[in-house]
Every structure is written in C-alpha cells, then in structure tokens.
Regions:
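PLP-dependent enzyme catalytic core of the Aspartate aminotransferase-like
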Residues: 2, 93, 350, 363-372, ...
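Conserved core segment of the aminotransferase class I/II
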Residues: 4, 235-309
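N-terminal small-domain helix-loop-helix segment of the aminotransferase-like
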Residues: 5-103, 147, 296-297, 395-398, ...
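Helix C-cap/helix->beta junction micro-motif
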Residues: 37, 137, 203-204, 325
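Conserved PLP-anchoring active-site segment centered on the Schiff-base-forming lysine
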Residues: 115-134
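Hydrophobic residues in well-ordered beta-strands that form the structural core
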Residues: 122, 143, 208-210, 372-374
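Active-site phosphate-binding strand-loop segment of PLP-dependent enzymes
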Residues: 148-224
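Conserved glycine-rich beta-strand-loop-beta hairpin in the small C-terminal domain of fold type I
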Residues: 308-316, 323, 329-348
C-alpha cells in the first residue's frame, strides 16, 4: 500500500546549532519512568533490538577486557580487515584502508556531516537524528519525500528539483543521506530508485551517505538490498554497526566504508582528523569483539538468521493489529519497525480532540502506556496522523523469555507476546471506536 503524497508538506527542520534530546531516547525514558511507577506499558517507541548478546560475543569481549591502550584512530587492523570482508561478501569489494571505525555509526554519521559541510538532503520521513545532527553542525536539512510505497530514499526527481531550487536560493546542499532498509517505515527502496538516486547525485555532485545498519534484517532474504555504493562508488559512504542485527547497541561500535579514489582519500583524512579530536578511537575491547562479529562465524550467522525471523514474525503480527483497527499499514520489509497511518480514522480521532500525530502519540502514552513516536519526529508535518512503531521490546521481560522467543517457530503465539498483541488491539479498538469512550479509566490489562 503506497504512502500518501507528501510533496507539498512543509519541511520540519530544527534551527541550525540547536536540538533537544532525541525523540526516541526521550520516549524510552518516559516509558521506563512509568514502568518504575508500576504502570503497565507497551514499549514500542525505542528502536533497540531487544535480544540478549550471543555468548560468543561476551566471550570475545571478556578476553579483550585488558586492552586499555589507545589504538589507531581509524580502528584496529583486525577490525578494519573484518569489516572489509563483511562488505566484500555483500558485493562491495573493500580494502581495509577504506574502513574507519568509531563509537557507533551515529558518531560516524555526525563526523561525516561535520567534515563534508553544507546542508544535507534527507528523506521524509527519516530517522530522527539526521536532521538533528545537521543542525548541530550549524547547517540544516533539506527534507525530500520518499517515492510511494518505498522508504529511506528521497524521490530522485523531487531531490533534483529540491536541490536545484535550494541552490538558486543560495543554500549549499552537499550531501544526501539514505537508509537501506528504512527507519521509520521498515520499507526497502527498490533497485530502480537507488540507481536513479545515484544518477542525480552524480549530476548534482552530491556525496551519498548510505546508512545500512538494518541490511542484515531484511525479512525475505530474496529481497535484496541495493546499495548506492554499487552504482556510485566514487561518492558513496556506507555505514553499519553491531547495534541492530547483533543487538549490541550499548557497545557503541560502528564502521564506515569510504569511497576509493582521490575524493574518498580526502574525505577519510578529514574524518580521521575530526575523530581524533572527538573520540580518539573506538573502545579497544569492543573492537576485538567486533572483528570477530564482522568475520561472521557460523554461530553468529545462525543467530542473525533466527533474529531476523523473530523480528519479521512479531512486526507483521503487530501490523495486522493496526490494519484490523482501520489503519493503512505498509507491510514492513525489514527490521522491527512499521509506520501505520491513522488518516482513515481522522474523523473518529478528531471527536476525541486528536488532530495531530503528536496528539495521538501523547494519548496512547499518557492514557494507555503505549509508547510510539509521531511522524513529526521523523520530519513529517504535525498534521500527519502517522506513528513509528518499534516491535522489538515485546519479546519478553527477561532474557529467558527473549531466548524462548528467539527459538520459537511462531513467537507471536507465546503467551507474553500474545498478551501484548491483545492489549494493543484493545487499546486501538477503544481509541478508534465510533463513539468516544474516554471519560473513565482505560480498559484494564
């Protein structure tokens, strides 16, 4: 099901140099506070992978715990070689000298925006931190809608028009960020869109930053990820990390693949200069474990396969509940996100005083303990009745439950996940009922 046309919607970008706390982190902190107060919650705002670390990763980290010296700014040779192999196996031949490691791909993305300079074009909707990081560099973001039924990549034709118009106005747009697969929609842009994006980037001399942190969580392995590095290798930076497919978000370890050639070497030198002044080097013990992880031994490859299946099963089960409530729900292709649109229910919501995405997210959180994020957090106008829903914290209250979910052929039927799904349906039925029923207390769990 295609997304509605958003080409006339105004961009929502923070003022240059200023930003508040990340919307995802703020929502997660609110949910944790409610949980501590004894309030039942459905935590679907924070994009954490929600699974225990594989024992092999804990072993590798423990064995490297004594590594307390600073290392190379670009990362250890073993890590850079392992990351190069990871990309080469995915059809992107990579030399270790093109790899830069950092304390998470988020830090690398900020470093790249900082040294590239100028404004950055971003998809609308797109991950909350792209525009915020652009603001922190003192520049700004140019929001460009995604094509219908796709996510993560600005519509190439609209991108060309938007950049040319911005430049005529004196704005200095130098780069474009894409997310393959996408956060917030869980969708994956097709090969024709990515290929045309590369053509536009070459015509307009834009650098491409391709955030591929969810690449290994595509639900159907036959649904291939097309990286812009395959079509515009001379101007594409690719980033990834351990946070999503291996659920190691707290380890803060990411890697970037810089373009080959003179431009790439200059960009790499600039990035290393910034890195040397900001983070010095990625944590040495984590680099050792990351080198093991990017080597993709069979035990970790199997773990990622099972994780992918769990994410797919629960994300689609949650999508079914939103669809049953009357929402438009583009089916997710990857990861643990979906992006339901309550537009068809706008009249019923207005009867409850809900007229914007932030209104809707606030109602779900404050009254029902259901955490989501409004589309406005991802660059949409406030009036968009769309929510980003993350399903990965529904897998269990402890590691025993989460591991059982990981091993289950039908995790959505496990009692604790089924209860969460039923609670979600109950809340959605109450919120979207033809007649308002909000005067008293919400229905109990």
């Amino acid at each position: 099901m295609p997304f509605p046309d958003r080409s006339d919607s105004p961009p929502a970008e923070p003022p240059a140099g200023r930003t508040g706390i990340s919307a995802t982190l703020a929502a997660n902190e609110t949910l944790e506070r409610k949980r501590r107060e004894g309030v039942p919650v459905l935590p679907m705002a924070f994009g954490e992978a929600g699974l225990p670390l594989h024992p092999a990763l804990r072993r590798e980290l423990a064995e490297a715990a004594g590594r307390n010296a600073y290392g190379p700014v670009a990362g250890s040779p073993e890590l850079r070689a392992a990351a190069a192999g990871y990309w080469t196996r995915r059809g992107l031949p990579t030399e270790p000298g093109l790899v830069v490691a950092g304390p998470g791909s988020k830090a690398l993305l900020f470093g790249l925006l900082l040294v590239i300079g100028g404004e950055v074009a971003v998809p609308r909707p797109s991950w909350v931190s792209y525009a915020a990081q652009a603001a922190l560099t003192g520049a700004g973001a140019l929001f460009v809608p995604t094509p219908p039924d796709e996510g993560g990549v600005p519509d190439p034709g609209l991108l060309a028009n938007a950049v040319q118009r911005a430049r005529r106005q004196g704005r200095d747009v130098r780069s474009v960020v894409v997310t393959l697969p996408d956060n917030p929609t869980g969708r994956l842009a097709g090969e024709p869109t990515v290929r045309r994006l590369c053509e536009v980037a070459r015509e307009l001399d834009l650098l491409i930053i391709s955030d591929e942190i969810y690449r290994d969580l595509v639900h159907d392995p036959a649904h291939a990820v097309t990286s812009p590095a395959a079509y515009a290798p001379e101007r594409t930076v690719v980033t990834t990390a351990l946070s999503k497919h291996l659920a190691a978000g707290g380890w803060r370890l990411g890697v970037a693949r810089l373009p080959d050639g003179p431009r790439g070497r200059t960009l790499r030198a600039d990035l290393l200069g910034a890195a040397s002044e900001i983070w010095s080097c990625a944590p040495a013990p984590v680099q050792r474990a990351a080198a093991y992880a990017f080597g993709e031994p069979p035990e970790l490859a199997e773990h990622v396969t099972r994780s992918r299946g769990l994410h797919a099963a629960v994300a689609h089960a949650v999508a079914d509940r939103f669809a049953a409530a009357g929402c438009r729900v583009p089916r997710p292709h990857a990861s643990f996100y979906l992006y339901p649109d309550f537009g068809p229910l706008a009249g019923r919501l207005a009867a409850r005083g809900v007229r914007t995405g932030p209104d809707l997210a606030a109602l779900l959180l404050d009254r029902y303990g259901v955490g989501t994020l409004p589309g406005s957090a991802f660059g949409e106008p406030d009036g968009a009745l769309r929510l980003r829903v993350a399903t990965s914290l529904l897998y269990g209250e402890d590691d025993e439950q989460r591991l059982e979910a990981l091993a289950s052929p039908a995790p959505q039927t496990l009692p604790w996940i089924a209860r969460s799904l039923d609670r979600l349906s109950q809340v959605l039925a109450e919120v979207t009922a033809p007649e308002p029923a909000l005067a008293g207390s919400p229905a109990p769990w």
